[in-house]
């Protein structure tokens, strides 16, 4: 079975590619988790974050925004010592700050899911790339999403991270045409 060329032989990576990446996500809390995790990969590989995902979930209350937003500096101090996650103070603080920004959006009547999906007109965008080199690392939509998230107070949401988030959550489907997960290729 052919997969996208970025997938290694790691079973965790294969399962992620086959079952999650590019699948449209419409749960606001899951989208919150993914924007936070995508920010953790800045300067690193996604597999590094993926291998630590369960630890992140444990450390950040299953990404419950209310509980994460209530975390304090003593929590940050504890987490920078936790080898189960990426021990970057700024990235840890970003998750907490992002939870606060997320809650502010929700309190203002804008569900995160509606906000995020508005950047693709609430419709998954399917590329028709035949090779990885044809897949962009950012687009005008990820530029706009990044700018809007930053304006709302989100951190670690540059355009490349936003595009990775859009790919991961199925706002765009960048499986290459020959991949088993490309639309229409799955049995």
Model regions: which residues?
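HhH-family (HhH-GPD) DNA N-glycosylase catalytic core used in base-excision repair
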Residues: 1-187
